[in-house]
């Protein structure tokens, strides 16, 4: 009863003081309560109250530090008396957050700032009293790491293969790399060899069995011909359907061209013989184009003038017949001696000689790309009056 009375009296006194505090509104309640807006004291009093609150908090923190230090000393004494190894004692001061508690030797300089550590160590003390005698040395590998202290495991390379042979892992890796450059190149070479072997088999089938040699199939060359030049115009046609009388498109041989002066073309048999002679004089390889170096003569189609042709034409003209002028003179001289009947017989010969002379001149004009007026002499300019330039030159 006495204890009940002792507890009841302070309770009643606390209720009375609480009523008095609500009425008087103490300074601490005004600072840290809900009635801060109703502050009725000076500003200096408010600053003093804040300084007082700060000192109270510092006192509390110092008290918790000392309490934690005392609990740690007691725990250390209990562990040393129970025979715990020295290298395992520091694990008793580890907290749940992975931060170890300060050892007794460094307690003055490094102390935790939480009061929870002291309470946890005090809770562990009663448990250690009964089971400290049965403690055994702990193993470092058996301690499970905390979530904060856990680190990712490093990458481990596979074990090196034995010297006697290749390991199974390397074999599987080689098989998986199907698109490696070496395998791609090997497959391409294999495909190329297959194509070559197919072509060689085709060639071997065409050759008779008695003519086969003992050479290696790699040394044999395919008999396929290069057919790119067949698109060009050639003089000989390999197709039997095309007649041999057809000539090439690019043919500049003047011997094959028919002159204008001939009234009748040669017979078709002679023309065919001429073409076949020109086309088959040089031996030709099948499928290949034979190139003949021909020095192009100056013709009217090219417009090139060759002055040596003029002398040749003059010589031919002299050899064939005399000039029309001499023929006219001879006709004039003999007209007085011979009768009129002989003149009538010689007129066709004179006309023929005139035509031949004109034809020679026309051929000469065609070869030299000139006109008939070029054979006439150039007119001489006659100066009737002296010009001013001539007077100036004569005066000087």
Swiss-Prot record:
Its main location: cytoplasm. Residues 1-22, 98-126, 145-168, 203-239, 254-274, 355-396 are annotated as: Disordered. Residues 355-369 have a biased composition (Basic and acidic residues). GO terms for biological process: cellular response to methylmercury. Residues 111-124, 159-168, 210-230, 370-396 have a biased composition (Polar residues). GO terms for cellular component: cytoplasm; nucleus. It is found in: Cytoplasm; Nucleus. It comes from the Eukaryota. The keyword Nucleus applies. Keywords: Cytoplasm, Nucleus. Involved in resistance to methylmercury. Overexpression suppresses a PAM1-SLV3 double null mutation. This is Protein BOP3. It comes from Saccharomyces cerevisiae (strain ATCC 204508 / S288c) (Baker's yeast). The lineage of its organism: Eukaryota, Fungi, Dikarya, Ascomycota, Saccharomycotina. The gene is BOP3.
């Amino acid at each position: 009863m006495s204890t009940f009375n002792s507890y009841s009296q302070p309770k009643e006194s606390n209720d009375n003081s609480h009523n008095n505090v609500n009425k008087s509104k103490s300074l601490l309640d005004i600072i840290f309560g809900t009635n801060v807006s109703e502050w009725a004291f000076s500003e200096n009093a408010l600053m003093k109250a804040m300084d007082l609150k700060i000192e109270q908090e510092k006192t509390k923190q110092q008290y918790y530090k000392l309490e934690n230090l005392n609990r740690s000393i007691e725990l250390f004494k209990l562990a040393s008396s129970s025979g715990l190894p020295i290298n395992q004692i520091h694990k008793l001061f580890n907290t749940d957050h992975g931060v170890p508690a300060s050892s007794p030797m460094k307690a003055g300089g490094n102390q935790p700032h939480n009061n929870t550590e002291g309470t946890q160590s005090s809770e562990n003390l009663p448990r250690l009293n009964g089971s400290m005698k049965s403690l055994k040395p702990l193993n470092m590998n058996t301690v499970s790491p905390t979530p904060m202290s856990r680190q990712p495991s490093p990458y481990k390379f596979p074990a090196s293969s034995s010297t006697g042979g290749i390991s199974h892992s390397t074999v599987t890796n080689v098989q998986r790399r199907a698109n490696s450059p070496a395998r791609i190149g090997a497959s391409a070479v294999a495909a190329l060899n297959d194509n070559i072997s197919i072509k060689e088999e085709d060639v071997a089938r065409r050759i008779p069995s008695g003519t086969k040699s003992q050479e290696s199939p790699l040394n044999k060359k395919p008999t396929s011909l290069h057919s790119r030049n067949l698109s060009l115009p050639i003089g000989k046609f390999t197709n039997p359907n095309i007649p041999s009388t057809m000539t090439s498109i690019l043919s500049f041989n003047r011997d094959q061209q028919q002159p204008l002066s001939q009234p009748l073309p040669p017979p078709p048999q002679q023309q065919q013989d001429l073409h076949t002679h020109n086309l088959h004089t040089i031996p030709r390889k099948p499928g290949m184009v034979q190139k003949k170096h021909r020095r192009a003569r100056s013709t009217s189609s090219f417009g090139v003038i060759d002055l040596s042709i003029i002398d040749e034409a003059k010589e031919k003209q002299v050899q064939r017949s005399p000039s029309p002028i001499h023929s006219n003179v001879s006709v004039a001289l003999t007209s007085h001696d011979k009768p009129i009947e002989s003149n009538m017989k010689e007129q066709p010969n004179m006309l023929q000689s005139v035509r031949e002379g004109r034809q020679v001149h026309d051929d000469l004009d065609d070869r030299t790309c000139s006109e008939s007026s070029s054979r006439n002499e150039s007119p001489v300019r006659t100066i009737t009056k002296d010009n001013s330039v001539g007077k100036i030159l004569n005066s000087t």
